[in-house]
């Protein structure tokens, strides 16, 4: 009896001491315990995602990759795997599990390794949200008390959902959704049992037990999880065996980017940081929907890069990127090649490769990610030697002339129906490019290419590169002339100018390119054929200051427009986006729209945080609505009208002729515009203008089609370097030779883009606005005629400006000439 009494007393003392100790610990740490009620409104750090307007993922920004999921969206097997491995008594304890700890301790003693977690899931959640990972007694005490508080606040289901979305699982992946994407490139619902078990085993050591770090460790840990699931009767023996037999592959899957638009993504990222701050932008799970259309963006990517590489290749091959081993040295092993090339960048569909052997008409190469491949002669016989921008060597007769074993080169795949059929020799271009597509009705930028490759160079040439625009400026000057009273039939003297510049003490002699002159020529032809001396004379008719002021209607700044007659030849400097904005005025019948890139921003719950409200074109009668907005002192939602509908129509007529020319070839009256290559589109609802700067340093094509304005630019980032010229190369399909220009160097990108963008878009009939007259004129004089033969044609005029004289009454003095400035001849 005495023994029993002593035992009871001892037990009572232990209980009292235990309770006292627990309360003592509790009151000691109480002031340091966080308010677990914050878990009710917790917002998990989730990266920002950037999408196209039609929902294609463009980019993801944020250190922590997380795909938040509801518990009901997670497979039952995943929940069971985590519970079996981390906390098999999860539904039986209240946050702290002494029995589980004891059992885990015995398991360690029995097996020598920890197959079961010592901390409950709730404790792990407490640690992840409120505590550090330092291994100290007081931290463990706090962890227990916080876990108990959490269990009182949240249901078991809520705790599980938070845990499975919060836990770190390696490779910047937080939560099971991100881990499924990172390791398997799948959504959680599509995981196999083996994949589920692998993810469920990661909380123990996510950095060292993931399959990318160690396939062996990941496999062993997965098998431990499967064994626990079998022990807990969550799976059958057959399911266990099948899951164990699944191979573990060490492959990392980043966020599944569906659309390549990195320059747009960077615009969105910078905009979000400026608007919301860096922390909120990167961690609040915002979904940013841009104005980019995935179809148009893919078309712009393809067109701009194909055109840039075509330019680069016709100028010749500059040689290998580097030499990995010399011909008389042992070749690298497949392991060396694979490891080396895996660390080299890939630029879009341009892959690094190593030359293994060279035959007379073929070469064997090792391509990054694709191993041994063969380059056929027809895929590399373009590679004559680059001498300088104006000179190329002779056509090669053998692959040995430009390739050797041990060289690192660049290759591109040829594809058919999505499958690779061959590999083509290529090179990283020295020149660069930009492309912009804009909706002229509201200013939405629907496609943007800022350069050859964002990884190669992050500078955005579409928005940041201010370049001389060359003849691209002429439509705006001719629009000013129409506003002044000139017409499409007005004759301007196409003759050389030689004017003395007193300030410089030299003669100024602007010339046509090519230097041919046709005498008195109609305004329509002058713009379509981009005649420089006519542009100068048109500028003089309007007046320099009046022209510069008029050009500000299109969004151009006065300080971008030189106060000299060189403005007529394109001495002004603008960005491709500004050019697209300017040409939108012609395309939309005279309205000024502002370019914008962000359509809306949604928070993780689908609520709209921001929605763009661009000023849109109003084609119907809006004057009553405008008066109403004025009375209410409210901003109008409509774009302001900056030129008349008639002016825009007549300018489009000249831009149409830049592509389609005019006259009849059968009667020797036919002529082409500088944009004639766009006739390949076989559409009569398009128009545009070439642009080539002095010494061909910049090449442009700017044009419109139904609902789209597109601008293509090609040039060197080094402003002093010109685009050069090439000799013919019969080994290049659709070869272009001679001096580079807007029509040769930029227009092909515009044509390829439009051919893709306008698929399934019906041709629009010409809409002639009110107050436009159509009369028959004489082709040579621009005066009225009664003749019905090839010497006559119909022309459009703003009502009241059509000619009143007939050709028989024509006298030479009706030709426009200028008295401004002293012309020597």
Swiss-Prot record:
Similarity comment: family membership: In the N-terminal section; belongs to the glycosyltransferase 51 family.
Gene name per UniProt: mrcA
Biological processes per GO annotation: cell wall organization; peptidoglycan biosynthetic process; proteolysis; regulation of cell shape; response to antibiotic
TM stretches of this protein: 7-27
Membrane-protein topology: Single-pass type II membrane protein
Domain of life from the UniProt record: Bacteria
EC number: 2.4.99.28, 3.4.16.4
Compartments (UniProt record): Cell inner membrane
Record InterPro entries: Beta-lactam/transpept-like (IPR012338), Glyco_trans_51 (IPR001264), Glycosyltr_51/Transpeptidase (IPR050396), Lysozyme-like_dom_sf (IPR023346), PBP_transglycosylase (IPR036950), PCB_OB (IPR031376), PCN-bd_Tpept (IPR001460)
Disulfide-bonded cysteines: none
Region entry Transpeptidase, spans: 413-752
Pathway: Cell wall biogenesis; peptidoglycan biosynthesis
Primary site of residence: membrane
Job of this protein: Cell wall formation. Synthesis of cross-linked peptidoglycan from the lipid intermediates. The enzyme has a penicillin-insensitive transglycosylase N-terminal domain (formation of linear glycan strands) and a penicillin-sensitive transpeptidase C-terminal domain (cross-linking of the peptide subunits).
One cellular-component annotation, GO: plasma membrane
Gene3D superfamilies membership: Biosynthetic peptidoglycan transglycosylase-like (1.10.3810.10), DD-peptidase/beta-lactamase superfamily (3.40.710.10)
S-adenosyl-L-methionine among keywords: no
Record-annotated active site: 86 (proton donor), 471 (acyl-ester intermediate)
Record's protein name: Penicillin-binding protein 1A
Reactions catalysed, as given in the entry: [GlcNAc-(1->4)-Mur2Ac(oyl-L-Ala-gamma-D-Glu-L-Lys-D-Ala-D-Ala)](n)-di-trans,octa-cis-undecaprenyl diphosphate + beta-D-GlcNAc-(1->4)-Mur2Ac(oyl-L-Ala-gamma-D-Glu-L-Lys-D-Ala-D-Ala)-di-trans,octa-cis-undecaprenyl diphosphate = [GlcNAc-(1->4)-Mur2Ac(oyl-L-Ala-gamma-D-Glu-L-Lys-D-Ala-D-Ala)](n+1)-di-trans,octa-cis-undecaprenyl diphosphate + di-trans,octa-cis-undecaprenyl diphosphate + H(+); Preferential cleavage: (Ac)2-L-Lys-D-Ala-|-D-Ala. Also transpeptidation of peptidyl-alanyl moieties that are N-acyl substituents of D-alanine
Keywords: Antibiotic resistance, Carboxypeptidase, Cell inner membrane, Cell membrane, Cell shape, Cell wall biogenesis/degradation, Glycosyltransferase, Hydrolase, Membrane, Multifunctional enzyme, Peptidoglycan synthesis, Protease, Signal-anchor, Transferase, Transmembrane, Transmembrane helix
Keyword Heme annotated: no
